[in-house]
C-alpha cells in the first residue's frame, strides 16, 4: 500500500537530497582524480629525470675516486653541477622528427631484446672494438638511459635478463671466468657493478648489515688496525713512537719498549678480529635481507657453471664469493660514505682500518671452509634454482617509466657503436636482427653527414657512396638537418668510434640493399618476449615506420673511419646542452591511473556478488573492443612486426584448420541425443545448415568456386585480424565453449561412427536437397567475403596453401558462418568493422545477400522433411560453430593462441597449443588438435557472432577453470589475463569487466565485431548448458559432428583427420567428466548471474545500425517471399522476424534495465545468447546515433509497406497452443529424437491475430484496460511455459527446432525457463491475461522494456539516453499510426496471418512493456532523466505538503508535485538549464501511469543502493592515488637525497684535492703554527673561521661554484677537513688533562650504570613512559658522537637523541611531553650510553657553536648540558 501523499513528498525530498549528496561527492572525487593523476604523471617524469641525474653524478664520482683515472676534480664538479641544472627536452623537438623516431625505434627494440644487447657487448669485449673508456660509456648509456638506473621493476627485470645472457655468452665460454669478474674487465662485471649500485634493495641490505659495525669502527678515532702491525710501526713518526712505546734503547728501557711493542701488536690484531667478528655477526643477522634479484643471478650463474662440467666446485664457490664479497659487500665497507650507508666523512686513517677489515673478511669467505661467511654463501644457493626473473622481483606499482633520458654525446656514441657492430662479420646475430638493426640505423644520419649538413657543405662527401645513397633517399632529412641548431652541432662534433674495417665493410651495402624489406614486421621474437602485458608492440609503435622508411632503399652504410679519442672535453656537459627524452612505449603506465567509470564498477559489482559467470565475457570484451577501437593502423603495424606471434591466425594452416573444422563431420548424423536440448541448441541450426550445405561440401559452389568466406572471413576478418594483434583479448573467453563442446563430443565415438555408411562428398543427398531448394538464386559473388585475401595479406606462407584453403572451405559464399537472419547483428557488424579496419578486400553483404538468404529460409517445404531428417549435426551446429566448438578447441585454443595471459587458463586439452613464446607463424604443431585449430580462427568469429559467447563463456570458463572457487574468485582470476598489462590487482578487479569501455569510446563497430562473430548454432549449443530447467544432456553430440565429417573429408585429408580423431578419442573421457561436473554445479553457479545482466551487456551489444539494417532488408525480402509462398512459409518468415523483434525488444529492455533481479537472473541465462550480451548495441558515439536515426526513418517507410502486405496476405489465425509455440519460437524440444523431420511442421505464428485491429483501437481508447489484461496474460504465460514446452517437445520435428534455432537468440525470454514468473515490484502491473505472444512476440521496437519482466526493479544504470530518446520519438510516431504499423515497427513485414499475429504481439508488447508505458517512452530514459534532475537540484524550502485529492485516479502524484516545485524554483532563480531539465522530466512523467511513478522511485532507490559500490570504489581509488602519490614523492625525495649525497662526496673530494696542493699545504702549516700559539678559546675559534672563509673564497673562484647549496657544501667540507686535521688540538686543547678528566667522568658513569634503572626513584620517570625503556636508539646516537669530528655533527647527534626520546614519549602518552617528562629519561639515556670524552665534547660544542644556537637546537643543547652537570653531581652510593 502506498504511503500518504505527504509522506511520499517527504520521501522524494529525502531521495533528492541523497542523490544530490551523491552527485556532489562523485564530482569532487573525479576532480580530485584529475588533479592527482596529473601530479602523478608529472612526478613520474620528474623521477625519470632525477634517476638520470643521480646515475650520471654517481658515474662521475666513480671516475674521480674509484677508477682513479686522474680526472680533474674541478671539471668533475662542473659536470656534476651541469647535470643538476640540465635542461630536459623532448627529442622530437630537438632532432628532426624522423630521426627521433628512428632513435626511439632503436631504443625500444634493444630495450626488449636483452639477448641482442648481450651479444653486442660480448662481441665488443671479444674483439676489443672499443677502448675501456668508450665501452664504459656504452655500459653507462645502457644502465642509465636504456634501463633508467634500475629504479623500476621492469628495468631491473630486463637488466637481470641482460646479465643472464652475458653469463651464457661471456662467462660460460671462458676458461677462467673469475678473471672476467674483475673490475672493468668485462661487460658483465661493469653491468653487475651498475646493478648493485642502483638497486635500492641492495642499499637496504648493506645499510642493515654494515651501518652499526661501521659506526663502531669510526668511533675509535685513535686506533690503527693492520694485519701486519710491523707496517704500522714503520708508519709512525719518531715522536709518535716515543709517545706510544717509550724510549727505544738497551736495558730496562729496551725491554719496556719491546713489551709495549708486543702489547701493541696483540691489541691491534685483537681489535681487528673483534671488529671483523662484529661485521660477521651483523651480516648473519641481516642475511635474510639479501636482495632476491642478486640471489637469483647467483643461483643462475652457479647452475649454468655446473652444467658445463668444466669447473670444479671450489672454483665455482670462489667465483660466487667474489661476486658477493669482493664486488658487492667489500666496496660498500671501504667506501661506505660514497655509497651512502653512513653520513660520516671517512678519513684516510679510517679507510685504512676498513681496508684491513675487508681483507680479513675476504680471507674468511674464500679460504676458511668452516667460517660463518662460507655458510652464508651456502645459504644463498638454497632455494628455487631456475626460477623466472619475474617471480623474484617485487611487484610494485608505484612507478611506470615511459621515457628514456640520454644526452647527445652518449646518443652519438651509442649509435656509432651499433654501426660498428653491424659492419663486422664477427657480430654473430641472425640475419633478421642484423637487417632490422641496419634498417633502423639507416634512418639515423651519420656524424659526417650531420657535420656536413650543419656546416652546409654537402659536397664534402659527394663521392662517398654512403652519402650519395642517403642523399637520394633522405633529402628531406638533410634539409631538416641543415636547420639544426647549436645542440646538433655539438652532437655532430661529439665522439665517434673508429672503424678500421670500414673499407672492406662497404661491400656489405649491396647485400643489404638486396635484402627484402621487413615483410609484415619480422621482428625478433625476443622483441615480443618481454611484453606479456600487451604493451610490447607499442614499444615499437613507430616500428612500422621502420619498415616503411628503412626499406625504401636507405640501406645502412658502413661507418666511415673517424679519429676518436676520449678526451676530457667530451666529458664536460655544457649547461645549455639539453638532455633528450625519448619515449618508451608503455601504455600500462597511463592505464593504471585511469579510474573506472560508474557503469564499469557496477558491472564488476554485479559480477563479484551475483554474476561471476559474466566476468570472463566482459574481460573478453575488454580485449576485443579496446584494441580494435583506434588501432586500425597500429594493429597493422603490429601485424607487420609480429611474425612469430602466436596470435597470427591469418596464415594458411590456420585457415585450413578452419576449413577442416567446419567440414570434418559427416552430414547425416542422427539427432537422438540432442533432442532433449535442441530447443536451445538448434536455435540457429537452420542457419548453420544453410551455411554448411548450400555450397555443397565437396561439390562446386553455385558460383563455381569453393570459397572459404563463411569459414574465414567471419572469424578472421573481424575477430581474426584483431586477434592477430590482440589475440589474448579476443580469444580470452573461449575456454568455456571449448569445455562445453569437448565434453559433448567425447563420448561413444566408435559407436557413432558404426551407425553410418560414409559416403563421398559429391553424392551427399543433404547437400543436393538444401542446395537445390534454397540456393538457386544465389551467386557466390553476392556476399563472398575476403578473409582469404585478408589472410593472404597477413599471412607468411600463404601462396601454395590458397588452393588447399579453397578446397576445404565448402560453405556457401553467400552466407557467413553465422547466417545473417532478421535481427541478427552479426555479419554486417563484422563487415562494417572490418571495412573500417581496412581489412575487407571484397564485397560486403548487402540487401541482395540477405534477400537471397531469406529465400533459402522460406523455400523449404514440408516435403523436404523426410530427406532432411538425416541432416547432420554439423548442419545443426554451423560451420563457424564447428570451428568454434570443436572438441579439442578448449579455452586455450582461443586464449593462449592470442599471445596473452589468457592461455594460462586453458583446459586440460591445451598441452600442444602454441604459447606466447612459440611461433604462431602458421606452422601448426606436428599433431595439432583439429578442434583447437578450428578454435584458433573460429573462436574470434564466434565471439562476434553471438552475444551468447560472452555469457556462456564467462560462466563456463569460470566454472571449469575455477571450479571449486567462489564466483568472485573465479571472476577475479579470470580477469587478470585480460586486463591491460601492469595494472594493480585492485584495479584489475574493477577493470576486468569494465575495460571494454575503452575501445567502445572510439569505434562503435569494430569493437563489437570481434566479439560478436559467433554462430547461432554455437550459441544455441552452448546455451543449452545455460538452461536452468532442463536436465544436463549427454555430452555426445559433437563427437558425432566432428568425426562423421572427418570421414567425409577423408578423401582430402585422411591423415590429418585421423590425427584429429585420435586426439578426440584420447580426451573423450576427460571432457565428458568435466562436462558432467559442470552440469552438476550449474544450478548453483548460474544463480550468480542475477543482477549484472543488463549492466554487463552494455558493451557486448553490437552497434544498433546492424540489427536495424537487417530488419529493413528482411522486411523487403519477406514481403516478396510471402507473396509467392503459402501460409506455412509466411509463418516461418514471420516467425523469424518475430524472434528478431523479440530480440530487439530484449535489447531495448536490457538497455533500459527494467528487469527484476530474479527475472534478470534467469533471462541472462535463458534469453539465449544474444540476450546475454545485447547491451553492447547501445549507441555510444554520435555515429551510432546517426545510424539509428537512419534506421528508424527507414523503418517507418518499411512499416507502411508491411502494413499493406499484412492487409493483402492475412492468413487464418492459429490455435492457442500452436500460437504460443510459434510466438515463442516453438522452443519446446521433442521428447524423442526420430532423426527425421516430421511432415507436419509447426510454423505457428503468434495467437490473437484476429484480435489485433480491435486491440489497436482498444489501446487507443482505453490503454489501461488492455494493459491489465496483458499483465494477466503475462502471468499465465509464465505459469504455463513448462507445460507448453513439454507439448511442443512432443509435437515438433527438426524443422520446428530449426525454426527455433533461427529465432531463439532474437527474442527476450527463453521458453525453457520460469524466469519471467517472478516479478519484484508492483504486482498490479503483471498481465492477468496469458498470451503466448506477450512475452516474445514482436512488439514495437520502440518499447525498451523486456516484455517478460513485468514491472520490475532495475538494478542497472543506463546510458546513451540521447540515442534512446531519438529512437523513442520515431517509435511513438510509428506506433501511433495503426496496429499494423505497430506490429511492423520491429521490422515484421510478413503478410497475411503472420503480419496479423505480429501486429497482435506488438499490441501486447506496447501495453505491458515497461510495466505499462506508453508506446515510444523509454522507461530507462525517464529514470535517467529523473535521476539527473533530482541530483542537480535541491529545495530551498521544504514547506510543502499535499492534501489527499477527491479523485485519487486524477490526482497529481508527489513526484510531479516535487518537480513542479523545482520548476517554479528554477524559474524564480532563472536557472535556464535546470528549467529545461525539470520540464522535460515532467513531460516524460505525464506519459506514465500513476503506479509507474512509484516504480520509478523504487528503482531510483535501488539504483542508489547499487551505486554504493561505486562510491566505495571512488574512495578506494582515491586512497590508491594518494598512496601512489606519496610513494612517488618519497622516491623523489630519495633520489634527490642520493644526488645531494653524490655532490657532497664530490665536493669533499674536491676540497681534499684542493687542500693537497703544494700552495695550500704551506698555508695549512702556517695556520697550524698560529693556532698552537693561541690559548684563549675565543681567539682559536676566530682564527679557524677566518681561515675557512679564506679557503672558501679561493675555491669558489677556482671551481666556479654558483649555487648556494654548493657554497654551503664547500664550507662544510672545508670545515670538516680542517677540523679533522686539527682534531686533537681543538678537541683536547689541554691535551692529557682533558683526556684524564673525561676518563674520570666515564668511570663515574660506569658505576652509576650498575644500579640505575628506569624505575629508580632518584630518576622519577613517570610510570606511563617506562614501556619504551631503555630507549636504545637514543643511546646509539650518543655513542656515535665520537665518529664525527665537527662540532655541528656532534650537536646533531645530541639533537637526534633527544628528538627520538620525545617522539617515544609522545607515542606513550598521546600528548607533547614537557621538559619535566623529558629530563629524567635523558639522564637515564646518558648514563646508559656513557659516551666517550663527554666533557670534552660539551666544551668543544660550546666553544664553537654556543653563541650561534637558537630555537629548538638551543633548548635541546641547554637541556643536555644540564643533564651532564647533574650526572657529575650524582652520588652512586645513594
From Swiss-Prot:
Named from the GO MF annotations, one term is: GTPase activator activity
Q: Where is the composition biased (Basic residues)?
A: 1038-1047, 1061-1076
Q: Which SMART domains match?
A: VPS9
Instruction: Point to the regions of Low complexity compositional bias.
Output: 519-533, 540-557, 1115-1125, 1310-1335
Q: Which segments does the entry list as coiled coil?
A: 1516-1546
What keywords appear on the UniProt entry?
Answer: Coiled coil, Endocytosis, GTPase activation, Guanine-nucleotide releasing factor, Membrane
Record GO cellular component, one term = cytosol
List locations, semicolon-separated. Answer: Membrane
Q: Which domain of life does the UniProt lineage start with?
A: Eukaryota
Query: VPS9 domain spans which residues?
Result: 1635-1774
Q: Which Gene3D superfamilies match?
A: GTPase Activation - p120gap, domain 1 (1.10.506.10), VPS9 domain (1.20.1050.80)
Mark out the compositionally biased spans (Basic and acidic residues). 674-683, 794-809, 929-944, 1048-1060, 1077-1087, 1246-1291
What kind of membrane protein is this, topologically?
Peripheral membrane protein
Gly residues bias: where? Answer: 887-905
Occurrences of domain Ras-GAP (ranges): 157-396
- Supply one GO BP term: regulation of protein transport
Coiled coil keyword on record = yes
Q: Where is the composition biased (Polar residues)?
A: 688-713, 1011-1027
Spans annotated as Disordered: 444-480, 517-564, 661-727, 784-811, 869-947, 983-1102, 1115-1142, 1214-1342
For whether the record's keyword set contains Transferase, the answer is: no
Similarity section: Belongs to the GAPVD1 family.
Q: Which PANTHER family match?
A: GTPASE-ACTIVATING PROTEIN AND VPS9 DOMAIN-CONTAINING PROTEIN 1 (PTHR23101:SF25), RAB GDP/GTP EXCHANGE FACTOR (PTHR23101)
Q: What does this protein do?
A: Acts both as a GTPase-activating protein (GAP) and a guanine nucleotide exchange factor (GEF), and participates in endocytosis.
Question: Know the name of this protein?
Answer: Receptor-mediated endocytosis protein 6 homolog
Protein source organism: Drosophila pseudoobscura pseudoobscura
Amino acid at each position: 500500500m502506498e504511503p500518504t501523499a505527504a509522506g511520499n513528498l517527504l520521501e522524494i525530498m529525502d531521495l533528492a537530497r541523497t542523490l544530490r549528496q551523491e552527485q556532489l561527492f562523485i564530482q569532487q572525487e573525479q576532480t580530485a582524480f584529475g588533479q592527482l593523476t596529473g601530479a602523478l604523471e608529472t612526478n613520474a617524469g620528474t623521477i625519470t629525470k632525477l634517476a638520470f641525474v643521480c646515475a650520471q653524478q654517481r658515474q662521475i664520482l666513480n671516475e674521480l675516486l674509484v677508477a682513479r683515472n686522474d680526472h680533474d676534480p674541478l671539471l668533475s664538479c662542473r659536470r656534476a653541477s651541469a647535470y643538476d641544472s640540465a635542461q630536459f627536452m623532448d627529442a622530437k623537438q630537438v632532432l628532426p622528427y624522423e630521426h627521433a623516431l628512428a632513435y626511439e625505434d632503436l631504443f625500444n627494440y634493444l630495450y626488449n631484446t636483452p639477448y641482442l644487447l648481450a651479444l653486442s657487448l660480448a662481441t665488443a669485449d671479444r674483439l676489443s672494438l672499443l677502448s675501456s673508456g668508450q665501452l664504459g660509456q656504452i655500459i653507462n648509456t645502457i644502465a642509465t638511459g636504456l634501463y633508467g638506473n634500475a629504479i623500476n621493476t621492469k628495468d631491473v627485470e630486463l637488466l637481470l635478463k641482460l646479465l643472464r645472457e652475458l653469463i651464457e655468452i661471456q662467462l660460460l665460454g671462458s676458461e677462467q671466468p673469475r678473471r672476467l669478474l674483475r673490475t672493468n674487465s668485462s661487460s658483465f662485471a661493469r653491468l653487475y657493478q651498475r646493478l648493485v649500485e642502483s638497486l635500492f634493495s641492495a642499499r637496504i641490505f648493506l645499510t642493515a648489515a654494515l651501518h652499526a659495525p661501521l659506526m663502531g669502527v669510526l668511533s675509535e678515532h685513535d686506533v690503527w688496525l693492520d694485519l701486519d702491525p710491523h707496517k704500522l710501526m714503520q708508519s709512525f713518526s719518531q715522536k709518535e713512537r716515543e709517545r706510544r712505546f717509550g724510549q727505544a734503547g738497551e736495558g730496562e728501557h729496551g725491554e719496556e719498549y719491546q713489551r709495549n711493542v708486543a702489547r701493541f701488536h696483540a691489541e691491534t690484531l685483537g681489535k681487528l678480529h673483534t671488529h671483523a667478528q662484529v661485521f660477521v655477526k651483523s651480516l648473519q643477522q641481516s642475511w635474510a635481507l639479501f636482495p632476491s634479484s642478486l640471489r637469483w643471478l647467483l643461483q643462475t650463474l652457479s647452475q649454468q657453471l655446473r652444467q658445463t662440467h668444466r669447473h670444479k666446485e671450489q672454483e665455482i664457490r670462489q667465483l660466487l664469493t667474489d661476486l658477493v664479497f669482493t664486488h658487492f659487500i667489500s666496496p660498500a665497507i671501504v667506501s661506505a660514505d660514497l655509497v651512502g650507508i653512513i653520513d660520516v666523512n671517512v678519513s684516510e686513517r679510517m679507510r685504512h682500518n676498513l681496508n684491513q677489515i675487508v681483507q680479513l673478511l675476504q680471507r674468511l669467505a674464500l679460504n676458511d671452509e668452516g667460517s660463518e661467511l662460507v655458510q652464508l654463501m651456502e645459504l644463498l644457493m638454497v632455494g628455487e634454482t631456475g626460477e623466472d626473473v619475474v617471480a623474484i622481483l617485487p611487484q610494485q606499482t608505484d612507478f611506470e617509466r615511459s621515457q628514456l633520458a640520454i644526452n647527445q654525446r652518449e646518443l652519438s656514441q651509442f649509435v656509432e657503436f651499433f654501426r660498428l657492430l653491424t659492419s663486422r662479420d664477427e657480430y654473430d646475430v641472425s640475419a633478421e636482427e642484423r637487417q632490422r638493426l641496419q634498417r633502423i640505423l639507416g634512418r639515423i644520419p651519420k656524424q659526417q653527414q650531420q657535420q656536413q649538413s650543419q656546416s652546409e657543405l654537402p659536397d664534402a662527401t659527394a663521392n662517398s657512396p654512403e652519402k650519395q645513397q642517403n642523399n637520394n633517399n633522405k633529402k628531406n632529412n638533410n634539409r631538416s638537418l641543415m636547420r639544426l641548431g647549436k645542440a646538433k652541432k655539438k652532437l655532430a662534433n661529439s665522439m665517434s668510434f673508429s672503424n678500421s674495417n670500414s673499407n672492406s665493410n662497404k661491400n656489405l651495402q649491396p647485400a643489404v640493399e638486396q635484402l627484402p624489406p621487413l615483410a609484415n614486421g619480422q621482428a625478433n621474437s625476443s622483441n615480443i618476449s618481454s611484453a606479456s602485458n600487451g604493451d610490447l608492440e607499442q614499444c615499437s609503435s613507430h616500428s612500422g615506420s621502420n619498415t616503411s622508411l628503412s626499406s625504401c632503399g636507405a640501406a645502412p652504410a658502413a661507418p666511415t673511419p673517424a679519429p676518436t679519442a676520449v678526451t676530457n672535453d667530451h666529458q664536460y656537459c655544457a649547461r645549455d646542452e639539453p638532455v633528450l627524452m625519448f619515449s618508451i612505449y608503455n601504455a600500462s603506465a597511463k592505464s593504471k591511473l585511469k579510474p573506472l567509470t560508474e557503469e564499469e564498477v557496477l558491472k564488476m559489482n554485479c559480477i563479484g556478488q551475483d554474476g561471476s559467470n559474466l566476468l570472463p565475457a566482459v574481460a573478453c570484451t575488454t580485449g576485443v573492443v579496446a584494441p580494435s577501437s583506434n588501432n586500425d593502423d597500429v594493429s597493422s603495424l603490429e601485424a607487420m612486426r609480429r611474425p612469430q606471434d602466436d596470435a597470427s591466425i591469418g596464415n594458411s594452416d590456420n585457415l585450413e584448420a578452419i576449413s577442416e573444422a567446419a567440414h570434418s563431420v559427416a552430414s547425416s548424423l542422427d539427432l537422438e541425443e540432442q533432442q532433449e536440448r535442441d530447443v536451445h541448441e538448434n536455435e540457429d541450426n537452420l542457419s548453420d545448415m544453410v551455411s554448411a550445405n548450400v555450397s555443397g561440401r565437396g561439390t562446386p559452389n553455385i558460383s563455381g568456386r569453393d570459397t572459404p568466406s563463411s569459414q574465414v572471413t567471419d572469424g578472421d576478418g573481424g575477430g581474426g585480424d584483431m586477434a592477430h594483434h590482440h589475440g589474448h583479448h579476443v580469444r580470452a573467453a573461449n575456454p568455456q565453449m571449448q569445455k562445453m563442446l569437448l565434453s559433448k563430443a567425447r563420448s561413444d565415438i566408435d559407436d557413432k561412427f558404426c551407425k553410418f555408411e560414409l559416403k563421398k562428398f559429391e553424392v551427399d543427398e543433404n547437400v543436393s536437397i538444401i542446395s537445390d531448394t534454397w540456393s538457386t538464386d544465389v551467386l557466390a559473388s553476392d556476399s563472398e567475403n575476403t578473409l582469404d585475401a585478408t589472410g593472404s595479406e597477413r599471412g607468411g606462407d600463404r601462396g601454395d596453401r590458397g588452393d588447399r584453403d579453397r578446397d576445404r572451405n565448402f560453405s556457401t559464399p553467400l552466407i557467413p558462418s553465422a547466417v545473417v537472419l532478421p535481427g541478427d547483428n552479426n555479419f554486417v557488424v563484422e563487415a562494417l568493422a572490418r571495412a573500417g579496419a581496412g581489412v575487407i578486400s571484397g564485397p560486403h553483404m548487402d540487401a541482395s545477400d540477405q534477400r537471397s538468404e531469406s529465400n533459402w529460409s522460406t523455400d523449404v517445404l514440408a516435403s523436404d522433411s523426410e530427406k532432411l531428417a538425416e541432416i547432420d549435426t554439423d548442419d545443426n551446429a554451423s560451420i563457424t560453430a564447428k570451428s568454434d566448438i570443436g572438441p579439442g578447441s578448449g579455452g586455450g585454443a582461443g586464449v593462449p593462441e592470442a599471445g596473452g595471459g589468457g592461455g594460462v587458463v586453458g583446459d586440460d586439452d591445451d598441452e600442444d597449443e602454441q604459447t606466447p613464446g612459440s611461433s604462431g607463424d602458421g606452422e601448426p604443431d606436428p599433431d595439432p588438435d583439429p578442434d583447437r585449430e578450428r578454435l584458433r580462427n573460429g573462436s574470434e568469429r564466434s565471439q562476434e557472432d553471438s552475444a551468447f559467447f560472452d555469457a556462456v563463456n564467462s560462466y563456463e570458463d569460470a566454472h571449469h577453470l575455477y571450479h571449486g572457487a567462489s564466483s568472485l574468485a573465479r571472476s577475479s582470476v579470470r580477469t587478470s589475463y585480460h586486463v591491460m598489462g601492469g595494472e594493480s590487482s585492485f584495479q584489475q578487479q574493477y577493470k576486468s569487466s569494465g575495460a571494454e569501455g575503452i575501445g567502445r569510446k572510439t569505434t562503435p563497430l569494430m569493437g563489437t565485431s570481434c566479439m560478436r562473430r559467433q554462430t547461432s548454432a554455437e550459441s544455441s549449443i552452448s546455451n543449452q548448458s545455460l538452461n536452468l530447467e532442463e536436465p544436463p544432456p549427454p555430452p555426445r553430440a559433437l563427437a558425432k559432428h566432428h568425426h562423421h565429417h572427418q570421414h567425409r573429408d577423408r578423401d582430402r585429408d585422411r591423415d590429418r583427420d585421423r590425427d584429429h580423431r585420435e586426439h578426440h578419442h584420447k580426451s573423450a573421457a576427460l571432457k565428458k567428466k568435466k562436462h558432467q561436473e559442470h552440469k552438476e554445479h550449474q544450478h548453483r553457479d548460474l544463480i550468480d548471474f542475477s543482477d549484472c545482466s543488463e549492466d554487463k551487456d552494455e558493451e557486448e551489444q553490437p552497434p544498433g545500425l546492424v540489427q536495424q539494417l537487417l530488419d529493413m532488408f528482411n522486411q523487403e525480402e519477406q514481403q516478396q517471399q510471402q507473396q509467392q509462398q503459402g501460409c506455412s512459409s509466411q509463418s516461418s518468415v514471420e516467425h523469424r522476424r518475430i524472434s528478431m523483434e523479440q530480440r530487439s525488444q530484449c535489447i531495448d529492455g536490457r538497455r533500459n534495465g527494467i528487469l527484476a533481479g530474479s527475472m534478470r537472473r534467469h533471462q541472462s541465462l535463458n534469453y539465449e545468447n544474444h540476450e546475454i550480451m545485447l547491451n553492447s548495441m547501445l549507441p555510444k558515439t554520435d555515429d551510432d546515433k546517426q545510424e539509428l536515426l537512419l534506421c528508424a526513418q527507414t523503418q517507418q517507410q518499411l512499416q507502411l509497406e508491411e502494413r499493406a502486405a499484412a492487409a493483402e496476405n492475412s492468413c487464418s489465425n492459429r490455435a492457442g497452443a500452436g500460437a504460443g509455440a510459434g510466438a515463442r519460437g516453438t522452443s519446446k524440444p521433442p521428447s524423442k529424437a526420430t532423426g527425421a523431420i516430421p511432415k507436419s511442421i509447426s510454423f505457428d505464428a503468434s495467437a490473437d491475430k484476429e484480435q489485433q485491429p480491435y486491440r489497436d483501437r482498444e489501446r487507443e481508447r482505453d490503454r489501461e484496460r488492455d494493459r491489465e489484461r496483458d499483465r494477466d496474460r503475462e502471468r499465465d504465460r509464465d505459469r504455463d511455459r513448462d507445460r507448453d514446452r513439454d507439448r511442443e517437445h512432443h509435437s515438433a520435428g527438426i524443422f520446428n527446432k530449426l525454426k527455433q534455432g533461427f529465432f531463439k537468440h532474437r527474442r527476450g525470454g527463453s521458453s525453457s525457463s520460469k524466469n519471467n514468473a517472478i516479478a519484484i515490484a508492483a504486482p498490479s502491473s503483471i498481465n492477468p491475461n496469458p498470451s503466448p505472444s506477450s512475452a516474445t512476440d514482436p512488439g514495437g521496437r520502440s518499447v525498451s522494456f523486456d516484455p517478460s519482466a513485468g514491472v520490475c526493479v532495475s538494478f542497472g544504470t543506463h546510458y546513451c539516453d540521447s540515442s534512446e530518446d531519438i529512437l523513442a520519438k520515431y517509435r511513438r510516431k510509428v506506433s501511433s499510426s495503426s496496429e499494423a504499423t505497430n506490429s511492423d515497427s520491429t521490422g515484421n513485414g510478413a503478410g497475411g496471418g503472420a503480419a496479423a499475429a505480429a501486429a497482435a504481439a506488438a499490441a501486447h508488447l506496447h501495453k505491458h512493456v515497461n510495466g505499462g508505458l506508453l508506446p515510444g517512452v523509454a522507461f530507462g530514459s525517464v529514470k535517467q532523466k529523473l535521476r539527473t534532475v533530482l541530483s542537480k537540484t535541491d529545495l530551498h524550502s521544504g514547506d510543502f505538503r499535499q492534501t489527499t485529492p477527491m479523485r485519487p485516479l486524477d490526482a497529481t502524484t508527489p513526484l510531479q508535485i516535487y518537480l513542479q516545485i523545482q520548476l517554479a524554483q528554477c524559474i524564480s532563480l532563472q536557472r535556464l538549464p535546470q528549467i529545461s531539465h525539470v520540464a522535460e522530466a515532467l513531460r516524460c512523467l505525464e506519459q506514465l501511469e500513476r503506479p509507474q511513478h512509484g516504480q520509478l522511485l523504487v528503482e531510483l532507490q535501488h539504483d542508489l543502493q547499487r551505486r554504493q559500490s561505486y562510491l566505495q570504489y571512488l574512495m578506494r581509488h582515491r586512497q590508491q592515488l594518494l598512496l601512489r602519490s606519496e610513494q612517488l614523492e618519497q622516491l623523489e625525495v630519495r633520489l634527490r637525497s642520493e644526488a645531494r649525497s653524490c655532490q657532497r662526496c664530490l665536493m669533499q673530494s674536491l676540497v681534499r684535492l684542493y687542500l693537497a696542493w703544494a700552495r695550500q699545504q704551506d698555508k695549512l702549516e702556517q695556520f697550524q703554527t698560529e693556532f698552537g700559539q693561541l690559548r684563549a678559546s675565543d681567539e682559536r675559534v676566530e682564527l679557524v673561521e677566518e681561515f675557512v672563509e679564506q679557503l672558501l673564497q679561493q675555491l669558489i673562484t677556482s671551481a666556479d661554484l654558483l649555487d648556494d647549496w654548493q657554497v654551503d657544501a664547500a664550507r662544510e667540507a672545508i670545515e670538516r677537513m680542517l677540523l679533522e686535521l686539527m682534531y686533537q688540538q681543538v678537541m683536547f686543547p689541554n691535551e692529557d688533562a682533558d683526556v684524564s678528566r673525561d676518563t674520570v667522568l666515564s668511570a663515574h658513569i660506569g658505576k652509576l650504570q650498575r644500579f640505575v634503572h628506569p624505575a629508580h626513584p632518584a630518576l622519577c620517570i613517570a610510570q606511563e613512559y617506562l614501556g619504551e625503556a631503555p630507549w636504545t636508539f637514543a643511546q646509539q646516537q650518543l655513542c656515535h658522537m665520537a665518529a664525527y669530528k665537527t662540532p655541528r655533527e656532534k650537536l646533531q647527534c645530541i639533537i637526534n637523541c633527544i628528538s627520538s626520546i620525545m617522539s617515544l614519549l609522545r607515542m606513550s602518552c598521546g600528548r607533547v611531553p614537557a621538559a619535566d617528562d623529558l629530563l629524567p629519561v635523558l639522564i637515564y639515556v646518558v648514563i646508559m650510553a656513557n659516551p666517550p670524552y663527554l666533557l670534552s665534547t660539551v666544551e668543544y660544542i660550546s666553544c664553537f657553536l654556543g653563541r650561534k644556537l637558537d630555537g629548538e637546537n638551543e633548548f635541546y643543547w641547554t637541556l643536555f648540558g644540564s643533564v651532564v652537570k647533574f650526572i657529575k653531581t650524582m652520588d652512586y652510593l645513594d
